[in-house]
């Protein structure tokens, strides 16, 4: 397969145009989001959905997340990532396969139907995780495009995927919220340097390869600005796979947590990685022939046992 988005192959970074649509469906009155929201996603590369879950559903999700964090021994050890300088849990991967509540969340029509509309296809979960940024100790995560990594290290061929961050704690301007460069999703910023074997073992704690150069980042930030979407628990932040994003550390006493779901179009199934010989492991990237997600409707608390 032709590599339409080469990266980590040259000595200098390049800004290349995006070759894929952002919104893959024509908006109609039957769409799960408004015309204004669809236009905003196309223009900015992200939107924020508020008040789509009830207070009971949010509490239900928070309890499920707390159960995952409280009993790491019950989880697959490979799926747990700790902070760089401590044993504090930073992320738990494959939550949709390790928690019935998170599996039901991933399949919920309020999320999955939006993904199906924006991607113009049936979808499956490429990756899922619970992110936790503890108070005082939560470390930063540097600027990056998810697609650059998914393309080079996982073999995702096209920009036909998106992420949804379901906030499980209040995201404020101060506790290390997600930051995005709106509009950056229309530029593919290549990275410099060959990727070492088993790069994921270190990159999940601190990424050193597949990192954008400062000059290009500055140009994107000056061109588009930087936004930090915030919200109360239950808020959902959707963003395109190529949107440049990152987060600061959390030196406040207020932890930040979110359930993170990556939806990929079934037609965009992973191929051989475009930049490495050995693909990343199963809990970071769903390989093989994907089955379309079976969308479920109704309140979370009525359809999943506690």
Swiss-Prot record:
The record marks 150 as: Important for ectoine stabilization. Its EC number is 1.14.11.55. L-ectoine binds at residue 127. Coiled coil: none annotated. 2-oxoglutarate binds at residue 133. Its cofactor is Fe(2+). It catalyses: L-ectoine + 2-oxoglutarate + O2 = 5-hydroxyectoine + succinate + CO2. Changing residue 149 to A: Strong reduction in the production of 5-hydroxyectoine. Changing residue 150 to A: Loss of dioxygenase activity. GO terms for molecular function: 2-oxoglutarate-dependent dioxygenase activity; iron ion binding. Belongs to the PhyH family. EctD subfamily. This is Ectoine dioxygenase. It comes from Sphingopyxis alaskensis (strain DSM 13593 / LMG 18877 / RB2256).
């Amino acid at each position: 397969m032709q590599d339409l988005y080469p990266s980590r192959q040259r000595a200098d970074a390049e800004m290349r145009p995006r070759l894929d649509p952002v919104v893959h469906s024509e908006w109609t009155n039957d769409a799960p989001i408004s015309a204004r929201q669809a236009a905003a996603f196309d223009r900015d590369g992200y939107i924020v959905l508020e008040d789509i879950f009830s207070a009971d559903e949010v509490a239900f999700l928070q309890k499920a997340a707390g159960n995952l964090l409280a009993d790491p021994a019950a989880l697959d050890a490979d799926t747990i990532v700790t902070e760089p300088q401590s044993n504090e849990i930073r992320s738990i991967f494959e939550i949709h396969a390790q928690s019935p509540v998170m599996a039901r969340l991933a399949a919920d029509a309020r999320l999955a139907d939006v993904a199906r509309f924006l991607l113009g296809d049936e979808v499956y979960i490429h990756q899922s995780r619970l992110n936790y940024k503890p108070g005082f100790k939560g470390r930063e995560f540097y600027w990056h495009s998810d697609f650059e990594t998914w393309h080079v290290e996982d073999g995702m061929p096209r920009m036909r995927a998106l992420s949804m961050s379901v906030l499980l704690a209040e995201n404020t301007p101060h506790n290390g919220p997600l930051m995005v460069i709106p509009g950056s999703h229309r530029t593919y910023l290549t990275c410099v340097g060959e990727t070492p074997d088993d790069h994921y073992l270190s990159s999940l704690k601190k990424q050193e390869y597949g990192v954008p150069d400062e000059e290009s980042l500055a140009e994107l930030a000056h061109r588009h600005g930087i936004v930090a979407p915030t919200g109360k628990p239950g808020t959902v932040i959707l963003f395109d796979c190529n949107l440049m994003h990152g987060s600061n550390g959390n030196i406040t006493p207020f932890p930040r947590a979110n359930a993170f779901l990556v939806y990929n179009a079934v037609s965009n199934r992973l191929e051989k990685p475009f930049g490495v010989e050995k693909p990343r492991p199963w809990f970071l990237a769903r390989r093989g022939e994907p089955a379309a997600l079976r969308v479920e409707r109704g309140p979370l608390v009525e359809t999943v046992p506690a």
